A protein has these predicted regions:
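Hydrophobic core register within WD40 beta-propeller blades
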Residues: 22, 122, 169, 219-222, ...
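Blade-level signature of beta-propeller repeat domains, shared across WD40, Kelch, NHL, RCC1
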Residues: 373-400
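A short loop-to-beta-strand structural motif that recurs across blades of beta-propeller domains
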Residues: 39-42, 128, 136-138, 198-200, ...
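Asp-box/WD-like beta-propeller blade repeats and closely related beta-sheet repeat scaffolds
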Residues: 54-73, 96-125, 134-174, 181-184, ...
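Beta-propeller domain segments
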Residues: 1-4, 64-74, 111, 166, ...
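Short coil/turn segments that connect the beta-strands within blades of beta-propeller domains
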Residues: 27-28, 126-127, 174-176, 228-229, ...
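Beta-rich catalytic cores
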Residues: 9, 18, 36, 54, ...
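Residue position within the beta-strands of beta-propeller blades
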Residues: 31-33, 131, 179-181, 232-235, ...
Length: 400
């Protein structure tokens, strides 16, 4: 059983295969994505007592035709599907004085029939459930109380595939803009599709494409800071530079800004492969708000908007750290918290630990029995944590 600070109680909320992201429907049903089986499950707590009474499969891809299971950031070691190591791709010798411009394929936002393929992020908006597949954004017509999809989804746009596979979705408070996170194809190669290593902005119907922010290697979690339209992301940085480089991070995301990848990290610190490249671009690289130990694999992020936790947790953020595969001593495998004071983040602290079954030193693979992925605040003010290795959702509530 994972361990939370004194005053909290941890329990198993649900058991289901490889749960990843979670989102609440307008009526309080909890929707859970499982990319490995291309399934979306719905859990219903009709009497709001914090225990679900009904469970159903909202949507599932056919056995044949579903997208292959995604390779999540750092989930099993540097095998098939892992980001390539340094030494491949464009190097500084071919880089010019200005960052290259690019345009996505002209028909990438062409609407049409859709399907489910390794779904990850989800969002409810204006009578639809939006789903981030690895290779597309689709939406299902949704009526309050639906436990099963009303037919096949509509595809709004295509996304590049390969490499980092998670696609998350977030709407602004007015519901006028949709934001989609797309990770890089490689570890740190230049010259990728400009829709990658970025947060993209669209209208709710998939039109109006633009790059909202770039240079973010693998932005996985997305959340709005309470009371604002400020986007925050939890992000996986690059590998193969030793145990302590490069730190992962959680950060607010500023419109039109560049966050360094692949040319630099933590602002203007050059990646060894690109020293001297694109100085004007690197000079304006943003320093992230909250640094997280390297290779922790920061995935889900949510702000605490409930009222059951102590005041110090209000409007602070929880981040799920999925855990490392390439450190001499394991990092991550826990949920961390950082408070917000006058809109600024404080230092991170452990919140939910105990997912490692050893000290995590010099092990391949790491001996663990759980890996946190998604975090969300339940309707009764608890924190839910999905665990795709332990195949369950954990609930952290205040002790009564």
């Amino acid at each position: 059983m994972p361990t939370a600070p004194a005053g909290f109680v941890v329990s198993s909320y649900a058991e289901l295969p490889s749960p990843r992201m979670m989102v609440y429907a307008p009526n309080g049903d909890l929707f859970v994505s499982s990319p490995a089986s291309s399934t979306i499950t719905v859990l219903r707590d009709a009497n709001s007592d914090g225990v679900f009474e009904a469970r159903g499969v909202y949507a599932q891809a056919p056995p044949r035709g579903a997208a292959p299971p995604p390779v999540a950031a750092r989930t099993g070691g540097p095998g098939a599907g892992a980001p390539p190591p340094p030494g491949r791709g464009a190097g500084p010798s071919i880089l010019g004085a200005a960052a290259p411009a690019c345009a996505p394929p002209p028909a990438f936002a062409e609407r049409g029939p859709g399907t489910l393929g390794a779904p990850f992020g989800m969002a409810f908006h204006d009578g639809y459930l939006y789903v981030g597949n690895t290779g597309s954004i689709v939406r299902y017509k949704y009526a309050t109380g639906d436990m099963q999809a009303q037919g096949e989804p509509e595809k709004l746009l295509d996304l590049p595939t390969g490499g980092h596979s998670t696609r998350n979705i977030l709407f602004n408070r007015a519901g006028t803009k949709m934001y989609v996170s797309v990770g890089s194809q490689s570890n740190n190669d230049a010259g990728e599709d400009c829709r990658r290593a970025a947060i993209l902005e669209f209208n709710p119907d998939g039109t109006g494409y633009r790059i909202y922010a770039s240079g973010i290697r693998n932005p996985v979690g997305l959340a709005l800071q309470p009371g604002t339209d400020t986007i925050w992301t939890a992000m996986n940085e690059r590998d193969n530079y030793g145990d302590d480089l490069v730190p992962d991070y959680a950060t607010s995301v500023k419109d039109g800004q560049f966050y360094g990848w692949p040319y630099s990290y933590i602002g203007k610190n050059y990646d060894p492969r690109y020293v001297g490249a694109f100085p004007e671009l690197v000079n304006r690289a943003i320093v992230p708000d909250v640094l997280i130990p390297a290779h922790s694999a920061a995935l889900g992020i949510t702000f605490y908007t409930g009222t059951r936790f102590a005041q110090r947790y209000r409007n602070g953020a929880f981040v799920a750290l999925h855990g490392s595969w390439n450190r001499s001593v394991a990092a991550g495998y826990k949920v961390v918290f950082f408070p917000m004071n006058n809109g600024r983040p404080g230092p991170i602290e452990d919140f939910l630990t105990g997912f490692l079954s050893s000290d995590g030193a010099n092990e391949t693979p790491i001996q663990q029995w759980g890996r946190p992925v998604g975090v969300t605040v339940s309707r009764d003010g608890a924190l839910l944590v999905s665990d795709d290795s332990g195949n369950r959702i954990w609930k952290v509530a205040t002790a009564r």
